[in-house]
Amino acid sequence: MLGKSTHKIAVIAGDGIGKEVMPHGVRSVLAAAKKFGIEIEVTEYNWSCDQYDQIGSWMPSDWKQQLDQFDCIFFGAVGWPDRVLDHISLWDSLIKFRREFDQYVNLRPVRLMPGVKSPLAGKKPGDIDYYVVRENTEGEYSSLGGRLFEGTDREMAQQISTFTRKGVDRIMNFAFELAMTRNKNLVSATKSNGISITMPYWDERFAAIGARFPDVSRSQYHIDGLTIQVVLDPGRFDVIVASNLFGDILSDLGPATTGTIGIAPSANLNPERAFPSLFEPVHGSAPDIYGKGIANPIGQIWSGAMML
């Protein structure tokens, strides 16, 4: 955020424990901004499943016009399945943000923090510290396909994965550039021995973009073997780049090895800043603990630190 006079942040606490942890996140961001001389202007939006019955959607129809003026979106959580089915609330909020604001990078740090016990024996802070760079707008979650002959013995469902050159190249480029700022080690998650069209293409673009970064050591693992190594030897990783589905898996598995996904942060980035980026904790809305005063705000605070 440095280099601009006033930074405008849209705050959306959302559902469940998002409403409980967001005040801690905002206070922390404002305190850090004051300490480092960063001018911040915060605007809060009370969009959630609460209003679904009234307006028939998670947020108003002009949401994009309202949010387009901001530099960043600071987000809490989405989902209250007793009111709105999860896939409806998610696709009516976060998925819209990611796609219509072209937030094509999902960035998740995986770090073992002091005071948190890893389920992996003998691990201490510093032993686990890497990033998962997930493609965030296409791939296996492209939503192309459909269903036919529902309710009959001919019923079928088909969903198509879409990998564009632009989409693959830009996520690879981001990952290589991130690796250059760290230990210059990048791993690609693939499955080209089983997924015979899209994954070989992914591998080809990994090699092509990698040729521009000769100082970065690069390797690739099939996703099944990679999940094993993330558990057995997480210290070997620095930056992992993955497709939408594989990144989704790895970015939950990784924080689990650090003791809990409950404090993990994430960033949904439009690196060119043509649209606002979104910062949110990994945890969900957790309706089962909402109102009990036990929600941990560290994920929200850490997401705020990534935003700054």
In which residue ranges do the predicted regions lie?
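Short acidic loop-to-helix transition motifs that present clustered carboxylates
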Residues: G115, Y221-I228
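Glycine-rich phosphate/diphosphate-binding loop of Rossmann-like nucleotide-binding domains
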Residues: A10-R27, A31-A33, T152-D224, R236
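Extreme N-terminal starter segment of soluble prokaryotic enzymes
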Residues: K4-I9
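Buried hydrophobic positions in well-ordered alpha/beta secondary-structure cores of metabolic enzymes
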Residues: D15-G18, D71, V133, A175, ...
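Short, acidic/small-residue loops that bind anionic groups at enzyme active sites
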Residues: I95-L112, R212-Y221, A264-E280
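N-terminal glycine-rich phosphate/adenylate-binding segment common to multiple enzyme folds
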Residues: D53-Q158, L245-G247
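Glycine-rich phosphate/nucleotide-binding loop
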Residues: Q229-L308
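N-terminal beta-loop-helix "entrance" segment that forms/cooperates
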Residues: G37-S61, V230
